[in-house]
């Protein structure tokens, strides 16, 4: 096998592995995947425009320039693509009632060897310490946005996550096997929404707002097992805000998905440690 063929096979395997890992975190968000694929292609093209990768059969810098341009076009197209509106036809959960319309979403689940009641208790007790990558991702976000990092006290490792959301103006509700939290912010006014109930959060339509709702549900899977799922939904209440949120969401959703995976892992450890 030639070096060129081996290099392309290795590069393809790495790309496939990256895409699978990326989508494991990001719940198969196509536009986010395409945006990051465009970024990777642009960086690869830039490198080839400087020094062509001859081991891949690329011998001219112009090829790198073409790859760079194609990557930029793909990235921009994925980031500015209009977000579709999803509507719940027949509400089945408290989350459906709190957020029946949304443009952005992610969902994750895990099996836990514990009863649903133990799982929901573990959800309530989960802390920021469960999110191992939170500090690193916040530093990256702050550097990218050129804003101060979140105060360490607000995100202390032993602080309960749901308590922090409540302190930020989010409202919670639900039932025995479902917890729903809803809130958000008015972007132009730079203030939190602070709804007084899930119903008020659902009906809020003031322009410039971004509403966020997420839930945890636990279902009996038999033989002492449960399936816990968490879904996040986001609604921007006008077109301008939706376009901005679309760009932001497609860039941050891999990190968001990673944190939710870690959150679920912490819930699993806590629930399975109960007698």
Roles of regions detected by a PLM:
Residues 62, 199-255, 267:
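Beta-strand/loop substructures that line and gate deep hydrophobic ligand-binding cavities in soluble
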Residues 1-12:
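N-terminal membrane topogenic signal
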Residues 25, 30-37, 57-63, 79-81, ...:
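Hydrophobic-ligand binding "helix-grip"
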Residues 126, 184-186, 208, 245, ...:
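Glycine-rich, low-complexity intrinsically disordered segments
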Residues 65-79:
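Hydrophobic membrane-insertion alpha-helices, especially the h-region
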């Amino acid at each position: 096998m030639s070096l060129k063929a081996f290099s392309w096979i290795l590069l393809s395997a790495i790309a496939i592995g990256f895409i699978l890992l990326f989508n494991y975190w990001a719940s198969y968000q196509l536009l986010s995947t395409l945006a990051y694929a465009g970024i990777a292609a642009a960086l690869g093209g830039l490198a080839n425009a400087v020094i062509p990768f001859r081991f891949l059969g690329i011998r001219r810098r112009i090829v790198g320039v073409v790859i760079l341009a194609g990557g930029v076009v793909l990235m921009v197209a994925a980031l500015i693509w209009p977000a579709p509106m999803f509507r719940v036809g027949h509400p089945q959960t408290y989350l459906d009632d709190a957020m029946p319309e949304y443009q952005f979403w992610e969902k994750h689940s895990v099996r836990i060897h514990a009863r649903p009641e133990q799982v929901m208790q573990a959800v309530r007790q989960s802390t920021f310490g469960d999110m191992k990558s939170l500090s690193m991702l916040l530093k990256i976000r702050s550097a990218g946005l050129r804003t101060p990092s979140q105060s360490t006290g607000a995100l202390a490792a032993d602080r309960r996550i749901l308590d922090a959301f409540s302190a930020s103006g989010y409202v919670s509700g639900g039932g025995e096997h479902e917890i729903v939290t809803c809130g958000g912010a008015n972007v132009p006014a730079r203030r939190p929404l602070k709804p007084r109930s899930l119903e008020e959060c659902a009906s809020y339509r003031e322009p410039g707002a971004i509403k966020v709702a997420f839930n945890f549900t636990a279902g009996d899977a038999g033989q002492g097992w449960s399936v816990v799922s968490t879904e996040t939904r986001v609604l921007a209440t006008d077109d301008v805000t939706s376009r901005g949120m679309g760009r932001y969401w497609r860039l941050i959703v891999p990190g968001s998905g990673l944190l939710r995976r870690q959150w679920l892992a912490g819930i699993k450890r806590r629930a399975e440690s109960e007698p």
